[in-house]
A protein has these predicted regions:
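Active-site phosphate-binding strand-loop segment of PLP-dependent enzymes
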Residues: 13-73
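PLP-dependent enzyme catalytic core of the Aspartate aminotransferase-like
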Residues: 51, 197-201, 210-244
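Conserved PLP-binding catalytic core of the aspartate aminotransferase-like
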Residues: 157, 169-201, 217
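Short beta->alpha connector loops at strand-helix junctions that form conserved
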Residues: 14-19, 93, 208-209
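Short acidic/glycine-enriched loop/turn segments that link adjacent beta-strands
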Residues: 103, 178, 212-215
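Substrate-binding/gating loop at the entrance of the active-site cleft, primarily
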Residues: 1-10
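PLP-dependent aminotransferase class I/II
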Residues: 88-168, 172-175
């Protein structure tokens, strides 16, 4: 979001998460011309409740509140039903995650008629990924045939929960996740050091050199075979460090 704000020379304020990676409704009770946040959060994977979202909406009746639900299909409760109650809510979702359609750059925005009409007014000026006919048709088929997507999501969720358990057994701190990744750190290993060691072995995870999260790694949930290779590396690495 800051990238686009900078691109269009918009003033903005980032809401800083607390030590537990949580947002607070009070953070949004200040003058603004719009609000956007991801739910589940990236990169933490944490989820805020529908009650939280409703409080933000009620506190900002004159502002559009955009909830980015890129990862919502991996265990979260969507706030889409709230668009019928709150005219200032817009929910955006992508086909790049749960529907495995990343190359198409396809997404949807859901809101009341007036809010969406304003998007139509400006979309050709700001949307750098116009949707071609073939992409539209594939997207429609994907929505009408969601069973395969749901089954894949359940598989990811099952592997994610196993991954959380396994990492905790290895001594990692693992916050709850409602996405297709986990956000982890080891209290006795530097985050960047572990990131580089994994990369050297061809295991790619994400690391950010930013305050509060610089000791954490974001690990995407892969196939069972990929995750077992990841666990095997960690066990060997921790053994070498004398931490197992």
């Amino acid at each position: 979001y800051p990238v686009y704000c900078d691109l269009y020379q918009m003033n903005y304020k980032e809401i800083i998460l607390d030590q537990d990676f949580k947002m607070h409704v009070e953070d949004f009770k200040q003058p603004n011309s719009g609000i956007i946040f991801p739910n589940p959060n990236a990169p933490t994977g944490l989820l805020v409740s529908l009650d939280f979202i409703e409080e933000v909406l009620k506190s900002n009746p004159e502002s559009i509140v955009v909830v980015d639900e890129a990862y919502i299909d991996f265990g979260g409760q969507s706030c889409v039903p709230l668009i019928h109650q709150y005219e200032n809510l817009v929910v955006i979702q992508t086909f790049s995650k749960s529907r495995s359609f990343a190359g198409a750059r396809l997404g949807v925005a859901l809101g009341n008629k007036e809010a969406i009409s304003h998007l139509y007014d400006v979309k050709n000026s700001f949307n750098s990924y116009p949707i071609d006919y073939i992409t539209q048709q594939i997207g429609i088929v994907s929505v009408l045939n969601s069973q395969d997507m749901k089954e894949k999501c359940q598989k990811v969720i099952k592997t994610r929960e196993y991954t959380k358990t396994k990492l905790k057994e290895l001594g990692f701190v693992v916050p709850d996740s409602y996405a297709n990744f986990v956000f982890v750190k080891h209290p006795k290993i530097d985050g960047k050091e572990l990131f580089l060691a994994l990369r050297k072995e061809g295991i790619i995870v994400r690391h950010w050199n930013k305050p509060l999260i610089d000791q954490y790694l974001r690990v995407t949930i892969g196939t069972d075979q990929q995750m077992e290779r990841f666990f095997e590396f960690l066990e060997n690495y921790l053994n070498q460090k004398g931490l197992l």
